[in-house]
Design a protein with these regions (language model features):
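GST-like domain detector, emphasizing the conserved glutathione-binding G-site
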Residues: 1-119
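Residue-level signal for nonpolar/aromatic packing positions in well-ordered secondary structure
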Residues: 52, 135, 153, 185-188
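Non-transmembrane alpha-helical segments in soluble domains
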Residues: 67, 71, 91, 132, ...
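Short, hydrophobic secondary-structure boundary micro-motifs
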Residues: 77-82, 147, 171, 192-196
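GST-like fold's C-terminal all-alpha helical module
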Residues: 97-180
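C-terminal end-helix/capping segment
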Residues: 173-194
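Carbohydrate-binding/catalytic loop surfaces
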Residues: 199-201
């Protein structure tokens, strides 16, 4: 298998963390984005990461689809358990973490490229604060705990992405449980090996 990624993408990082947690043999190829000459384009004309090429040439993109495929490639505990209450709990937590990541990634892009008026930016911050407050309460109540799973990986990648690449929003303020969650998960070897470069916004 071959995984195309960009070091600044939190979505690609989610998959790179999963590869390491599952101890899978995957070749990683770093590519450029927003580049008409990117080596990614023959594999994914949309130019998005992560993109996974299977051994038979099949192409998968979107991090959740790639996670689901990787989970079929090992015999251990699943990152996406699909049976019983644990499966639905994991999917619920995963959905909340992805919604959080998506919301702040849009805000981050708007700040970076100056695409929105101040009023829109203010609305994005309010949405991010609401989501972070809900996640703080969820973590305080015992969510995103236990053996590593996809929901924890996505939430950890999201929080560290914001900490390293979105400096205008201090999500840690008043959210000790989220802060502790990130400190703990960031210490895992899979996270330490895939740290994103910093970006000052």
């Amino acid at each position: 298998m071959k995984l195309f990624f960009a070091s600044g993408s939190p979505y690609a990082r989610i998959v790179r963390v999963a590869v390491r947690e599952l101890a899978l043999d995957v070749e990683e190829v770093e590519v450029t984005l927003r580049d008409p000459n990117s080596s990614l384009l023959p594999y994914n004309p949309g130019g998005k990461v992560p993109t996974l090429q299977l051994d038979d040439g099949t192409i998968l993109n979107e991090s959740l689809l790639v996670l689901a495929y990787l989970d079929t490639q090992h015999g251990g505990r699943k990152l996406l358990p699909m049976d019983g209450a644990d499966g639905w709990r994991t999917l619920s937590e995963l959905g909340r973490a992805y919604a959080f990541l998506d919301a702040v990634t849009v805000w981050n892009r708007e700040l970076r490229f100056g695409q929105s008026a101040p009023g829109v930016i203010a609305l994005e911050k309010q949405r991010a604060d609401r989501a972070a407050d809900a996640l703080e309460a969820a973590v305080a109540g015992g969510a995103y705990s236990g053996p590593i799973d996809a929901g924890q990986i996505v939430l950890g990648a999201a929080l560290e992405n914001f900490a390293r690449r979105h400096k205008v929003w201090d999500w840690r303020m008043g959210r000790p449980h989220l802060s502790r969650f990130l400190d703990d998960i960031a210490a895992r070897p899979s996270f330490a090996a895939t740290v994103q470069p910093e970006l000052n916004l």
